[in-house]
Amino acid sequence: MIYHLSIGKPDQVEELTKLIHRLSSEFQIFCFQGEMGSGKTTYIKSICSAFGVDDGEMSSPSFAIVNEYSGQNARVFYHFDLDRIEDPSELLRIGWEDYLTSNNLIFIEWPEKAMSLIPEDAVIIRIGHESDVELRTLEITTL
């Protein structure tokens, strides 16, 4: 299924958050694709916040590759930023398969760096810019 959303600013994500919440009952992995500065990290932070993660606990995992957040009801979220990896095998060395089998929600920025390791049932969220600098179009694809 394909969903299309238009969002005025990355912090105006209520509709996206509701959709991700609904999809999270069926899907575990959410991949965010978009140019640098398109709002990937901001969207993920907003979604995690809606799941009860403390805003102060969240940061971009650019240097750590993965951050772990705790939300409501002891729910755990993994936030990956794959921009800095040079080879997908780097993920295997940090326990990638354990993350995938954890049954926790996984949000991935720059998934194209390791598509060979991302399960086929991952939700792909493509973020595009319109001519208006603030407007983002999102295409969310599920199996």
Where are these regions (language model features)?
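Hydrophobic anchor at the beta1->P-loop junction of P-loop NTPases
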Residues: 30-32
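Short beta-strand-centered segment that lines the nucleotide-binding/catalytic pocket of NTP-utilizing
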Residues: 54-68
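N-terminal pre-Walker A segment at the start of P-loop NTPase domains
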Residues: 1-18
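Phosphate-binding P-loop
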Residues: 21-27
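Conserved lysine of the Walker
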Residues: 40
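Short phosphate-coordinating micro-motif centered on Lys-Gly-acidic
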Residues: 1-3, 89-91, 97-143
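P-loop (Walker A) phosphate-binding loop of NTP-binding proteins
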Residues: 35
